[in-house]
UniProtKB/Swiss-Prot annotation:
Its cofactor is Zn(2+). It holds the Pfam family Peptidase_M14. It comes from Drosophila melanogaster. This is Carboxypeptidase D. Residues 26-1312 are extracellular. The gene is svr.
């Protein structure tokens, strides 16, 4: 029996062994034939495979259609379960999703393998069968089929611009989900533009009671768990933990511990303890899918990074399957940990949406499904659990111990009793209706719901009107003042918006400004009427409701209330009340891009208020409502030369012949102006007003500069400085029409006013954020390479108005990689598109490779160098690059105070043919430390560029000599302040170099610096400032203005620095302007001061950022030498005329030729120019030259011919016209070629024909009779000059008649030297005579007034009395022979010694 029993036992063991897949001596072979010929399945192959599996396993497999991608590809999920037709009660649904980023493909193929493996092996492997039978599994191999189609196999990193990572719109889907930290209005706005792939997944996730999920990515090897972001929005390295952190860590470890590589945590140059990480600790992102699952559903989701390479070769897929198979299966089993159960009512019916709470984890209750099911994942432990539901009593807490030892979760059911209800009292539904239907009222009151009075409102009436309407609609309006007028009146603005009070991300800001000219009142009254119209129609007019809900509107009704108060009703074209109380036209008072004059030199309070208001809000579109004409006017309002030509500012009834000045957005501006004009019943006709019959405006629109020049205008300032597109709308020919006419104006302008507001939505808009979802403020958004930029706001939202069609969009954020993409604005209503932009963090080394010849020192570990370190670095650069660099240190008085580095090609060769540039770290000692770090970076850039033979650098050094001055004098004082407080920002010294240069006191540094400028005669100078990002330069010269624009035009325009004002910053700004003007006026040196930072001495880590933001502007400055004109000036014998000079016509600056070969060279922007070449005693020459960009035009040798003066020679100018008179024009100069102003030029014998020279020595005399005439020039302190001319042609002016006056060296007919000599002798003789006479008079008076004046013998005294040696007392020792009659009390004595006798006299005075 024992033997038989042993036999049966052995047989039983053998039988059992047959059912175990991995027992010793027996293994069930798995079906993994799908690993043969590994490849990535295409979309078509994937769909066919899923269809085949569904057909092969009709009960266990089912394909679900989730939605379509942006390009129409199917999003599919394969369900694998015991019975796909009907899920068994309490079977937990689990999902695996992959290929969210289209170029991260390993997970996509692993889920394909997973489907084949589960279905092919669940019947032969019992554990696998148990898993499939007890779990409802959903596999989504690709969430982003469009991105996958764009990706390329073998690329371990994303393609340029992250093509393939995002969907077809290049949107990162893992930033597109609703976020738990979003405000409700942001959530609603983002929902409007959610990508179809995201929307499909969101709907699917919330529609099923998923318990567990995994999202498979690539690019690292780690298991990441929520949360992915935090309230602090740190970039990284700070954990953001869920209430279920212990569960998530267990889930992550389940995957990692079963992965042979992941569990080590050190793959891909990363370091993750145990192969897991909290998402926010790794890097933060908002809008991620795993956070959405946990926050908005019951699902616990992990993000699994599978491989270092995002899209590895297909041959690696079998190896990846073997690494991840166990982890995939074990994670599925985690759906069965914790507790599960049903929540039902007393009758056993399921309660949907009941909440199941675990004590200590109340922040995350589990909601029941429609069938009353719940699952609560928990780690082992003792828990107290209860359930609650609306309308039911909360259950009693139940204590439960979780061990997770079983194959299924511990079951815990709840039955809830209904809440007892006892409603006392009578209730009735109150329905509130208007007394009259809105449609009837609108028809009765012409679109309004209440009667409307068309009348004028003075300031008091307007203020009362606005207060009343604001109090009537408090939920839609906000009344606020932006400042006060000169006379103290408030500048009232009414905000109209669904939720007024603050900027709402994603909602555009719009403004209307009226009554800028106090006597132009139509805009003001129409805005008051428009306000009433919109508020009354809100809620019963779909158009108005949509406008108010989606647009934040601001109406400034009167910008000039003081002017309005003195205006006169009925004024059609007058000027009373046009200006403010200071008599200033406010539309001439804004800062102008081309210059400053008396109209905008001092900012008026109304203008300052409007500027501050405009800059405080992200206005997208604006209109300035005027009167006096009927036209829509768009920028620019003036040209670059209009500050020098007052005649261009006159409205002379004709726009023919005026030069337009379009912006880069000219087509867009014309479209906006056309929208307003075409909506007006007559504006589009372009007919003139009665008083200006020659003003015709095609299509009712005009460019401002082409109409008439307005310098200091508001619409140009809005475009250039505030980034807001603004039009000026002239609303009618009459400025202050009668009140009875206002109803007609309202009928004409109502539709244009509304249509113009609606244009704020046209174009491109969205949000700019980082890869972790952090909003990026100040990001630059540009279209089609234009220089005009839009900037994202605090929440990352941006608006870029654009016409329908394809555009190239460029986005740049500080410390983020640039992003370029092509977008298409639809050509159907509403002509807008949402484009959210994700920027990747920038790599400094990558930037250095692309922009700075890979000079890592310029961007990594930046610091402030001490004076010895700076000198050592400059000396080292000279030693290593002697052919292009020369270090000046203690080689002269200048080099002792200012160490400098001189750079040019072939040091030591003649430099007459080269431009001279000066780059100074700063003229402020407190800014110099930052400036000289930028200067050192620039030197390294040029040196490295020359080593690499970069074309631009080599050409620069061939054409120029550049002096670099890193100021060192007070560095240690400033550096000590910084070391004591690294956040000092703006150190302050009492005596800056710039102030010393402007001051009258003698200073060694100042003197040697100014002497250096005089001796070297630089062409241009660049220096660095702080406190702003502006570029300061001499105003008024169009060439210098073009240079400034060229410097500021960079590929990527960073957001202008918004630096808070301070007293020292304002002082530096004013000092810089004075210094710039002084340098230009006295030393003929244009100085450009580039603002590079808010702080004068920011933290040294920020030096790299300052360098990166400004390198392009600095390079643009140096590139100015590439364009210009040059030549040699010689006489007719080929000899150089070293006293010659060159003047650019219509410009003040004069360029002297070089002292050796008489060469001149001018840096000029491209364009057509006129040059006047002049030399003493030689006829001037006028030369027309067309300067091409990037090329120095060589004029060769310019031959000058001597003057023919009036010494019996007559200069004939052949003409053929028979007119009786002509005109003569020219210039009067002194011998040094300086203009002589106020010189009298006249025709001898014709007393009425005379004129005086202007500031540049120019003159013109008209109506000069034909024939032989004599011109005479007279000027104070100069000898007069005459010239005889023979004029025989009338009508055509005789130009370029140049006089050179000699200084009158005679005074009173004597040569100046002889006069000075004679005058000096006469003065000396006169002085001597006066002294002698005074002395004689003094002695006479002294003698006459002293009666005791007398002579006496010297008293004879011994040594006792005189206190002298024995010899002094005489040999005989006598004491006194005679007593002197002089009074003894007189003590002062004067000895008079007669040289011809031996007598001594004593004159004693009282």
């Amino acid at each position: 029996m024992p033997t038989l029993g042993l036999l049966f036992a052995s047989i039983g063991i053998a039988v059992l062994a047959m059912g175990v897949p991995h027992c010793r001596g027996y293994t069930i072979k798995e079906d993994e034939s799908f690993l043969q010929q590994p490849h990535y399945a295409s979309q078509e192959q994937l769909e066919d495979l899923f269809a085949g599996l569904e057909k092969a396993y009709p009960n266990q497999a089912k394909v679900h259609f989730l939605g379509r991608s942006l390009e129409g590809r199917n999003l599919l999920a394969l369900q694998i379960s015991r019975n796909t037709r009907s899920r068994n009660l309490l079977t937990p649904p689990v999902k695996y999703i992959a290929n969210m980023h289209g170029d991260e493909t390993v997970g996509r193929q692993l889920l394909v393998y997973m489907a084949q493996y589960l279905l092919g092996n669940h019947e032969r492997i019992s554990d696998l069968g148990q898993l499939v039978n007890s779990t409802d599994i959903y596999l989504v191999p690709t969430m982003n089929p469009d991105g996958y189609a764009l990706s390329q196999e073998g690329n371990c990193e994303s393609l340029p611009n992250y093509v393939g990572r995002g969907n077809a719109a290049n949107i990162d889907l893992n930033r597109d989900f609703p976020d738990r930290l979003e405000q409700s209005h942001v959530h609603q706005l983002r929902a409007q533009s959610r990508q179809p792939e995201t929307a499909a997944l969101v709907n699917w996730i919330v529609s099923k009671p998923f318990v567990l999920s995994a999202n498979f990515h690539g690019g690292a090897v780690v298991a990441s768990y929520p949360y992915d972001n935090s309230l602090a929005h740190n970039e990284c390295c700070e954990e953001s933990l869920t209430p279920d952190d212990r569960v998530f860590k267990q889930l992550a470890h389940t995957y990692s511990d079963n992965h042979p590589i992941m569990r080590k945590g050190n793959n891909c140059n990363d370091s993750f303890s145990g192969g897991i990480t909290n998402g926010a600790h790794w890097y933060e992102l908002s809008g991620g899918m795993q956070d959405f699952n946990y926050a908005f559903s019951n699902c616990f989701e992990l993000t699994i990074e599978l491989s270092c390479c995002k899209y590895p070769a297909a041959s690696t897929l079998p190896q990846e399957w073997q690494r991840n198979k166990a982890s995939l299966l074990q994670l599925l089993r985690q759906a069965h940990i914790g507790i599960k159960g049903l929540v039902t009512d007393a009758s056993g019916f399921p309660i949907a949406d009941a909440n199941v709470y675990v004590a200590g984890l109340e922040e995350k209750p589990m909601r029941t499904s429609k069938r009353g099911e719940y699952w609560r994942l928990l780690t082992p432990g003792l828990y107290s659990v209860h359930a609650s539901a609306f309308g039911y009593q909360t259950s009693a807490p139940q204590q439960v111990r979780v061990t997770n030892d079983n194959q299924e979760a511990l079951r815990l059911d709840f039955k809830l009793a209904p809440v007892e209800t006892n409603f006392d009292g009578n209730f009735r539904k109150v329905k509130v209706e208007r007394s009259e239907p809105p449609q009837k009222l609108k028809k009765q009151f012409n679109g309004f719901l209440t009667p409307t009075k068309y009348e004028h409102h003075n300031f008091t009436a307007m203020e009362s009107y606005l207060r009343a309407i604001s109090s009537s609609y408090p939920s839609l309006t906000r009344l606020y003042s932006i400042g006060k007028s000169v006379q103290g009146r408030d500048l009232w603005v009414l905000e109209i918006f669904a939720t007024p009070g603050s900027h709402v991300p994603g909602v555009p800001e719009f403004k209307y400004v009226a009554n800028m000219h106090g006597n132009e009142v139509v805009g003001k009254e129409l805005l008051l009427i428009l306000t009433k119209y919109m508020l009354e129609r809100y809620g019963n007019d779909d158009r108005i409701t949509k406008l108010v809900n989606g647009t934040r509107m601001h109406f400034l009704y009167s910008m000039n209330p003081d002017g309005y108060e003195i205006s006169i009703e009925g004024d059609r074209t007058g000027g009373v009340g046009r200006a403010n109380a200071h008599g200033i036209d406010l539309n001439r008072n804004f800062p102008d891009q081309y210059g400053t004059d008396r109209f905008n030199k001092v900012t008026e309070p109304e203008v300052a208020a409007v500027m501050n208001w405009t800059l405080s809000l992200p206005f997208v579109l604006s209109a300035n409502l005027h009167g006096g004409s009927l036209v829509a006017n768009y920028p620019f309002d003036d040209n670059e030369n209009d500050f020098n030509d007052p005649f261009m500012r006159l409205r002379n009834s004709s726009i023919n012949g005026r030069k337009p000045n379009p912006t880069e957005d000219n087509a867009l501006f014309k479209h906006l102006a056309g929208i307003y004009s075409n909506a007006h019943p007559t504006m589009y006709l372009g007919q003139p007003c009665e008083l200006f019959q020659n003003e015709f405006f095609p299509d009712g629109i005009t460019n401002g500069a082409q109409w008439y020049s307005v310098t200091g205008g508001m619409q140009d300032w809005n475009y250039v400085r505030a980034g807001c597109l603004e039009l000026t709308i002239e609303m009618g020919c009459d400025k202050f029409p009668k009140a009875a006419e206002l109803s007609r104006y309202w009928e004409d302008h109502r539709e244009p006013l509304l249509q113009f507001i609606e244009q704020v939505h046209c174009g491109i808009h969205g949000f700019v954020h980082s890869t972790i979802g952090t909003p990026i403020a100040g990001a630059v958004v540009r279209l089609d390479g234009a220089n005009h930029s839009t900037y994202s706001q605090v929440f990352g939202d941006y608006w870029k108005l654009a016409l329908p069609g394809r555009h190239n969009l460029t986005v740049l954020g500080d410390n983020y990689a640039p992003l370029r993409m092509e977008v298409e604005v639809p050509d159907v209503h509403p002509f807008e598109m949402r484009m959210d932009i994700t920027l990747m963090p920038d790599d400094p080394q990558h930037w250095a490779s692309a922009n700075d010849f890979r000079i890592i020192e310029n961007v990594v570990n930046t610091r402030y160098h001490t004076n010895p370190q700076v000198r050592a670095r400059l000396a080292e650069l000279e030693n290593q690059n002697g052919q292009i660099a020369s270090f000046g240190y203690a080689d002269s008085e200048f080099g002792t105070i200012f160490n400098y580095l001189k750079m040019t090609s072939d040091i030591g060769e003649p430099e007459e043919h080269k431009y001279k540039l000066l780059v100074v770290s700063s003229l402020y000692d407190t800014t110099a430390p930052l400036g000289r770090e930028i200067l050192l970076n620039l030197i390294r850039h040029l040196v490295e560029g020359f080593k690499l033979q970069d074309t631009s650098v080599v050409e620069l050094l061939k054409r120029s000599v550049i002096y670099f001055l890193p100021q060192t004098s007070k560095f240690q004082n400033v550096f000590d302040m910084y070391n004591s407080n690294t956040s000092i920002c703006d150190p302050v010294l009492g005596d800056e170099l710039a102030e010393r240069i402007l001051g009258p006191e003698t200073d060694q540094a100042k003197d040697v610096f100014l002497q250096f400028l005089r001796s070297e005669r630089f062409d241009l100078m660049l220096t660095f400032g702080a406190g702003n990002s502006d570029l300061n330069y001499p105003k008024g010269d169009s060439v210098l203005v073009k240079f400034a624009h060229r410097m500021q035009r960079t590929e990527f325009n960073y957001s202008p620095l918004q630096c808070p004002p301070s007293a020292t910053r304002q002082l530096h700004r004013e000092t810089t302007e004075r210094l710039t003007n002084m340098m230009y006026r006295i030393y003929n040196l244009p100085v450009y001061t580039l603002g590079i930072s808010c702080c004068r001495m920011p933290h040294q880590k920020k030096i790299a950022s300052v360098w990166r933001k400004n390198i392009d502007k600095i390079k643009n400055f140096l590139a100015l030498v590439k364009t210009g004109v040059s030549g040699l000036v010689q006489n007719d014998k080929g000899q150089p005329l070293r006293e010659a000079y060159v003047r650019l016509l219509e410009h003040d600056r004069i360029i002297n030729v070089t002292k050796n070969v008489a060469r001149f060279q001018l840096m000029l922007p491209h364009g057509l120019y006129g040059l006047e070449v002049t030399a003493p005693n030689y006829e001037s020459q006028m030369i027309k030259v067309d300067v091409e960009d990037g090329r120095v035009t060589e004029l060769g040798i310019i031959r000058m011919h001597p003057f023919t003066l009036i010494r019996g020679v007559v200069l004939e100018l052949p003409n053929n016209d028979n007119r009786a008179t002509t005109s003569i024009a020219g210039v009067v100069l002194d011998e040094s070629n300086h203009p002589v102003r106020n010189a009298k030029v006249s025709v001898v014998g014709q007393t009425q024909l005379r004129n005086f020279t202007g500031s540049m020595g120019q003159y013109r005399i008209s109506a000069v009779p034909l024939g032989t005439i004599t011109l005479k020039v007279e000027a104070p302190r100069h000898l007069e000059a005459t010239r005889q001319m023979h004029l025989i042609q009338g009508g055509l002016a005789t130009e370029n008649v140049v006089f050179h006056l000699k200084v009158n060296e005679h005074v009173f007919g004597l040569p100046r030297f002889l006069f000075i000599l004679c005058a000096s002798v006469l003065i000396i003789v006169g002085v001597i005579v006066c002294v002698l006479c005074a002395q004689f008079w003094f002695y006479r008076r002294h003698r006459g007034d002293k009666p005791y004046y007398n002579f006496s013998l010297l008293p004879q005294r011994g040594k006792e009395q005189f206190g002298l040696e024995d010899d002094d007392g005489g040999d005989d020792g006598e004491t006194e022979l005679f007593r002197s009659p002089i009074k003894r009390e007189l003590s002062q004595r004067a000895h008079l010694v007669n040289n011809q006798t031996n007598y001594s006299f004593i004159i004693q005075a009282a």
